[in-house]
Amino acid sequence: MLGFLRSPKFWNDGNSVVVKVLDPVSRLYSFVSNVRLNSVTPVKADVPVVCIGNVVLGGAGKTPTVELVCNLLREKYKSPQILTAGYGGYLKNVVRVDTNLHSYLQVGDEALLSANVAPTWVGRNRVNSAKAAVACGADVLIMDDGFQNNSIEKDLKILVIDSRQVFGNEHLFPAGPLRELPESGIAKSDLALIIGEKNEALESRIKAMKSTIPIFRAKMEITDSVPVENNRVVGFCGLGYPLKFKQTLVECGYEVLDFVSFADHHPYTITEIQKLSNGAKSVNATLVTTMKDFVKIPAVFRNDVSVVKIKLVPENEDFKKALLEKL
């Protein structure tokens, strides 16, 4: 239901009339979510489980965090494998993602990206996914977007927060972007990873909620620069927090002549990409997007779009040290 939701403006405005109207619905959403979570008894997996999650609907940076954690765990484990629900895809039963066989329509865009990092399992039933992964040699599991899923017992829970987005207007869905209250998410977290610029107010707030939680910082960096004439680009993406991609382009020195945002997990049409391509050509700019968006572009137009590859880079070695010590 939430797969193709575009973040409304009032999600950043706590005083909006719309927020006040939707607050009763938010309370109902919270009640139903809590009942669902508390009605499940977590199952202990046969290998350690690292859970990556957030308290907002998209945009915090879970997918690049999954890649980072997976790569760091390889220093201690032979076969880290990833569990994801496959949001945006129609396959519901457990399946190992094959990038040569599956499309984003089947397994979702994020699962296709994860499958390039490590064996990735899609399935609504995370317990069955975990069993399948272990049967195929997994010695540690990374559970993507697992904070609101109690089906598996977690050995380490990492809360991901974007330093600009933070918690939006601080209201629960649908009045705001929160899936659960920040206090709840922080209370059950073992580590907090803040992505973006330093935000001392946010760090102080986290410590006030849970004084013992270690806080780490990381930044998004472009790994492969796109050959761009005169540094002129037109960017587009369908992310939970699209402004993050635009800001990354600006910070890396590109002149962003135009930027178009779509709903998270948006499936692109030929008409949309043709319009974007024509717009970029009209201003003598290169059309750029993220890898997550590129996998959903109709094949006939992929030569017209350049991919800006981005990875998450920790501020220092402390995050890796804490990660490996806790498992």
Explain the meaning of each model-derived region.
Residues Y87-K210:
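Phosphate/Mg2+-binding loops and adjacent switch elements
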Residues L28, T63, S114, D144, ...:
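Residue-level signal for inorganic ion chemistry
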Residues L37-N100:
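Walker A (P-loop) phosphate-binding motif
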Residues M1-P48:
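A transmembrane-helix-recognition feature enriched in membrane-embedded lipid enzymes
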Residues L191-E200, A218-D224, F236-Y241, F262-Y268, ...:
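G-domain G4 guanine-recognition motif of GTPases
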Residues A263-D264, D304-L327:
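Short, flexible loop segments at boundaries between secondary-structure elements
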Residues K157-I161, I186-G196, M209-N230, V234, ...:
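Conserved beta-strand/loop subsegment of P-loop NTPase cores
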Residues I222, V226-I270, L324:
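Redox- and metal-dependent alpha/beta enzyme cores, enriched for Fe-S-associated oxidoreductases
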